[in-house]
Amino acid sequence: MDRKALESVAKHYPYLHLQGLYAIPAGLSWFLVGLSNLQRQPVKPLVLGAGALVGLGVFGVVALYYRNHFGSPTPTRSRQVRQYVALALGFAVFVGVDQLARTLLGRPPGQPVSSYAASWAVGMLVFYAIVGGLRTYHVVIWGSLFVAGVLPIWGLSVDRDAVASFPIGVATMASGIFDHYFLVRAFQSSKRQSLEHTNAGA
């Protein structure tokens, strides 16, 4: 299938937001956020810089992979709008839930829970629900993070939010890998249907 035909299929394909391998550098970014915010055992800037370079390198490899396998399509305007709305509402829910929890539990929360992790999980569920629909693995992964966030296992350390960045990073990468798997399977099916339609009209 040539590049133009590939991009024609991808342009109208509804799951391009599931280019989940981008979640690998995103997850690495969460690790860097956590490391950079540790107060009791701060990480040296050199380590953070090296981590950032690794993340950029991985991002470049992922971008090259998707360009070679899916082309460089421009999503339809309606799909772009939906993605922007999903991002905005997901982030707004994260901030709102986190601030509500801190208002009720104190700043920082007086209970050994992580409102940060739990709120981010809720925001991601909202994002996926809007942008393309929740799938079982979304509910399992982000639901598990939410449950972990509300369990009294976090202690009362000043590094609580920084530590929460690590499971958020793991959940991000896990969700992304499943997204990618779903994307590849469904896109191949869409591509076959497009080829069959083209051959039938020839």
Please identify what each model-predicted range represents:
Residues 24-105:
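Selected alpha-helical membrane-embedding segments in polytopic membrane proteins
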Residues 1-21, 197-201:
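N-terminal juxtamembrane cytosolic/stromal segments of multi-pass membrane proteins
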Residues 128-202:
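Terminal transmembrane helical module of multi-pass membrane proteins
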Residues 47-56, 112-123, 164-176:
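Hydrophobic core segments of alpha-helical transmembrane domains in multi-pass membrane proteins
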Residues 8-11, 62-74, 186-198:
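Juxtamembrane membrane-water interface segments of multi-pass membrane proteins
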Residues 9-19, 41-49, 133-144:
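Membrane-interface helix-loop-helix junctions at boundaries between adjacent transmembrane segments
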Residues 83-149:
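Membrane-proximal helix-loop-helix units in multi-pass membrane proteins
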